[in-house]
Amino acid sequence: MRACLICNTSATVENYARVEAQEYVRCSRCGLIFVDAIKPPDKLYHAYDGGALKAWRRKLVAPWRGFTHVRNFDQSMARAKRIFDFVTAQKQTLPPHPNWLDIGCNKGFLLATAAAQGWQVYGVELVPELMQPFQRRFKQFAHNIFSQRFIDVQTQFNNDTFDVISAIDVIEHFEEPRRDLSGIYRILQPGGLFVAQTPDGAAKQAETLKERWGALKPLEHLHLFNAANLEIFAKQLGFTEIKFFPPFEAADGNLVAVMRK
């Protein structure tokens, strides 16, 4: 079995659930739930693109789709505004032109919301077609969008660059969370915030449903934290203050973490 990335040992790791012929294990010391054998990157990314037919259709439509021409656009923008308001309420002081990086920015609704309030925005999104309408609509930020893994993109940013970094429903996808979160810490400004929503490995569903828990997706959700072990992990990386909040919406037992550098 793989070692727990927080406790740095495999001695405390035990079987948890078997999903789609893959084993999830759990650390008996800290409670981290994780996929024991992570598939190669090409297998993981195939899960994100939705398969050949869906990917082909998305590539065909993307050059013609407008930023607002998506299903449930108003609801998506309302959700982005709720997240933006929550995050900015946690950040008391800001420079004149603050910088916001959204990892896993999807179609760019949160970035559009921040841009409308004067932020300089940057995004990381593995599926490039999703962000093309945003890039056409917000041409001034078109070159701030990166279609790579964050672990590969982060080397392009200087230390102490961002006032806020968000990762909504993302950190569970990280293949190497220690490298990814270390990169996030490095490029945050002193006093900057990292805001993440992620499935809660201590949620009631984790015990009552186990393999039927919707958060268990072995090609996508590779590491499932809980509040206690995520706080330990964040402090190992240097974050000085970690707070937890209810999720932005109820889904499979999520939590929201706010970490301050």
Features from the language model and the residues they span:
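Short, solvent-exposed loop/helix junctions and linker helices
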Residues: 21, 174, 221-224
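Conserved N-terminal segment of class I S-adenosyl-L-methionine
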Residues: 1-160, 164-168, 178-182, 245-248, ...
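Short N-terminal helix/helix-N-cap motif within the alpha/beta-hydrolase-1
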Residues: 175-179, 206
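A short His-aromatic
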Residues: 169, 173
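A short glycine-rich, Lys/Arg-flanked "PGG" loop and its adjoining helix->strand segment in the class I
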Residues: 178-193
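Short, glycine-/aromatic-enriched active-site segment of Class I SAM-dependent methyltransferases
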Residues: 196-223, 228-233
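A structural motif corresponding to the C-terminal end of an alpha-helix
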Residues: 233-239
